[in-house]
Amino acid sequence: MSTKEATSETAVDYSLSNPETVNKYKIAGEVSQNVIKKVVELCQPGAKIYDICVRGDELLNEAIKKVYRTKDAYKGIAFPTAVSPNDMAAHLSPLKSDPEANLALKSGDVVKILLGAHIDGFASLVATTTVVSEEPVTGPAADVIAAASAALKAAQRTIKPGNTNWQVTDIVDKIATSYGCKPVAGMLSHQQEREVIDGKKQVILNPSDSQRSEMDTFTFEEGEVYGVDILVSTSPSGKVKRSDIATRIYKKTDTTYMLKLQASRKVYSEIQTKFGPFPFSTRNISFDSRTNMGLNECTSHKLLFPYEVLLDKDGGIVAEFYSTIALTKKGTIILSDSEPKEDFIKSDKKVEDPEIVALLETPIKVTKNKKKSKKPSKANE
């Protein structure tokens, strides 16, 4: 990049006060929401998780191509499709050669789907939980899905200027308890910025005593964007563990290191070029016999962050809902969201706390883009 180009880029206003920034987040959110609805429809008895993940990424790419059509537009997948059933808490996205590629969904499976898109580096991720069933869902599966959905709604309304991260942690815990469930221990929600989905400000779920004492307390502020990731389990502890399943989702970090292996340099160069700072699936890179060796060196020296496949320690059912929100001058805007199908989840439990009930009934702004496309500013061309 030339000095002139660098100076021009630093002059661009990427804050929420720039309507174009908000518009890009909204477009990314619409893409993510529309795609995840289609992926939910793919979750039928006999459907293989590998096929669903591949099709999810195809749908993301197809949808992304149709929006923000400018010359050399910077846009793409912000999180590859992950499909995690039952006690698999997160990040299952297998290669065709993996044993899990043959894992097929069956009736009654509780399936979590996570994916996301970005426009010009502004990412909107979304996650939902569905059940492979034609009939309404009852029992523990219904309880955990209802708990996670209600907890997300409460978090969306608690994350606002003046409140702290611990208020969110505590209200999610109270709601999960109302449904006889537990938030998944140690799961994080992050502040987001351009090209950053894991910013410094974090909200932790179900922290240990040491995590609670070590994590900073912070106040939410106007102008911030958050990826709100709520995971709840039917298990009594909510604790998860790393599985033996191969990690297939990674993200490039800001760490620097002189790689020794040619295979490492090759794969790292491809990652930089194709995905930049966003998570990617190794399904989408050139794979040969030395690729795993290259990925291992990159990971061991922290050039790549691995999104490991996590399992509930006690075999509990895990539900997840993820929403991207923006704290604007006019209030909170929900940029991406996904709720369970109406009248599909039949839990016999509910939130009783009158303050939380009132909070859940508080209106919140949901984005609706105008059908007429807006011409991007020159800064985005």
Swiss-Prot record:
SUPFAM superfamilies: Creatinase/aminopeptidase, Winged helix' DNA-binding domain. The modification Phosphothreonine is found at T362. It comes from the Eukaryota. It is found in: Nucleus. A non-essential protein that preferentially binds curved DNA. Binds non-curved DNA with a much lower affinity. A motif (Nuclear localization signal) lies at residues 368-375. Pfam families: Peptidase_M24. It comes from Schizosaccharomyces pombe (strain 972 / ATCC 24843). PANTHER family: PROLIFERATION-ASSOCIATED PROTEIN 2G4 (PTHR10804:SF11), PROTEASE FAMILY M24 METHIONYL AMINOPEPTIDASE, AMINOPEPTIDASE P (PTHR10804). GO terms for cellular component: cytosol; nucleus. The lineage of its organism: Eukaryota, Fungi, Dikarya, Ascomycota, Taphrinomycotina. Belongs to the peptidase M24 family. The modification Phosphoserine is found at S8. Signal peptide: none annotated. The keyword DNA-binding applies. Keywords: DNA-binding, Nucleus, Phosphoprotein. The keyword Nucleus applies. Its main location: nucleus. This is Curved DNA-binding protein. One of its GO terms (molecular function) is nuclease activity. NCBIfam families: crvDNA_42K.
